[in-house]
């Protein structure tokens, strides 16, 4: 019995120590904006989803203004399969035709968005689900991708349909929500000036939002610990120039390249620091913001 009691006391002491050590970081981020891109494995795990929602609620209770941007690629693919809609790919990238973009909007701005809102509201906060269409928050234009043909080595342009890139962000609505103690949860769907609807990569959307809000931090929750060196060791902090060198020498490769490039663009647009971290770690948002060492890779100018 005494051992059990002592063990319980030890746990409480550790919790109290963490809260005490977090105070200077809470003060550091008070009244600041933190944009969190929520995606990857964490979105499909109910326990991690609840932990994430509690983290966001705690940020708000600590005087921080969190803004959540979410993805939903696997969920979109699942619904398309159930509806019998075949996806067409160009060089590994899904072509979003008029029928598919309707499904994308339904899944992202509908079911996924409202699930996240409900999780945060269950923690006693006041979250609201939006997309780029609401309040003319974001306008997009059609995005094109260029690839090098492996056989001819000739560059060609890919038309991916209703895939867009943000070109304008109006922060007015987001500022009003922050003043109203509300937490925006944003789906990466936006209108174009041409009246069409565009699906936007969630990382790019989050970077544009963070830049417009001049966020203190932009956090990318991924399925990896952060940027790794060639030995697989986590790199705790990088400058933009260091990150660019790592891309050139092949240390940063594959899917991490566009993510780091998005980080760099966000920094150029006014974000103070961008962090790539593992969303599969419970409470990774708190561990990154409220501890000295953090748990991901911080990229700064």
Curated annotation (Swiss-Prot):
The record marks 37, 259 as: Transition state stabilizer. It comes from the Bacteria. Substrate binds at residues 72-73, 94, 199. InterPro entries: AceGlu_kinase-like_sf, AcgluKinase_fam, ArgB, Asp/Glu/Uridylate_kinase, Glu/AcGlu_kinase, NAGK-C. Pfam families: AA_kinase. GO terms for molecular function: acetylglutamate kinase activity; ATP binding. One of its GO terms (cellular component) is cytoplasm. The keyword DNA repair does not apply. It is found in: Cytoplasm. It catalyses: N-acetyl-L-glutamate + ATP = N-acetyl-L-glutamyl 5-phosphate + ADP. Keywords: Amino-acid biosynthesis, Arginine biosynthesis, ATP-binding, Cytoplasm, Kinase, Nucleotide-binding, Transferase. The keyword Transferase applies. Pathway: Amino-acid biosynthesis; L-arginine biosynthesis; N(2)-acetyl-L-ornithine from L-glutamate: step 2/4. Disulfide bonds: none annotated. Its EC number is 2.7.2.8. It is an enzyme of class 2 (transferase). GO terms for biological process: arginine biosynthetic process via ornithine; L-arginine biosynthetic process. Catalyzes the ATP-dependent phosphorylation of N-acetyl-L-glutamate. NCBIfam families: argB. Belongs to the acetylglutamate kinase family. ArgB subfamily. This is Acetylglutamate kinase.
């Amino acid at each position: 019995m005494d051992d059990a009691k002592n063990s319980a006391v030890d746990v409480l002491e550790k919790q109290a120590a963490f809260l005490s050590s977090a105070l200077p970081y809470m003060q550091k981020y008070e009244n600041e904006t933190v944009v969190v891109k929520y995606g990857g494995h964490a979105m499909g795990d109910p326990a991690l989803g609840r932990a994430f929602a509690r983290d966001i609620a705690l940020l708000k209770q600590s005087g921080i203004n969190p803004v959540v941007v979410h993805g939903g690629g696997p969920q979109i693919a699942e619904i398309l399969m159930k509806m019998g809609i075949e996806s067409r790919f160009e060089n590994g990238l899904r072509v979003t035709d008029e029928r598919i973009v309707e499904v994308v909007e339904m899944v992202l701005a509908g079911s996924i968005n409202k699930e996240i809102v409900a999780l945060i509201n269950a923690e006693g906060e006041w979250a609201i689900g939006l997309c780029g269409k609401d309040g003319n928050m974001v306008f997009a234009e059609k995005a094109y991708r260029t690839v090098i043909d492996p056989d001819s080595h000739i560059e060609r342009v890919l038309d991916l349909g209703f895939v867009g890139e943000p070109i304008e962000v109006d922060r007015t609505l987001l500022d009003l929500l922050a003043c109203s103690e509300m937490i925006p949860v944003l789906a990466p769907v936006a209108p174009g000036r041409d009246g069409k609807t565009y699906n936007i990569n969630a990382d790019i959307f989050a970077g544009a939002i963070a830049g417009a809000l001049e966020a203190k931090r932009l956090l990318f929750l991924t399925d990896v610990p952060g940027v790794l060196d060639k030995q697989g060791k986590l790199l705790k902090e990088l400058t933009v120039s260091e990150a660019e060198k790592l891309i050139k020498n092949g240390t940063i490769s594959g899917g991490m390249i566009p993510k780091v490039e998005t980080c760099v663009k966000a920094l150029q647009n006014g974000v103070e620091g961008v962090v790539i971290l593992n969303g599969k770690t419970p409470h990774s948002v708190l561990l990154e913001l409220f501890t000295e060492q953090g748990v991901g890779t911080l990229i700064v100018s």
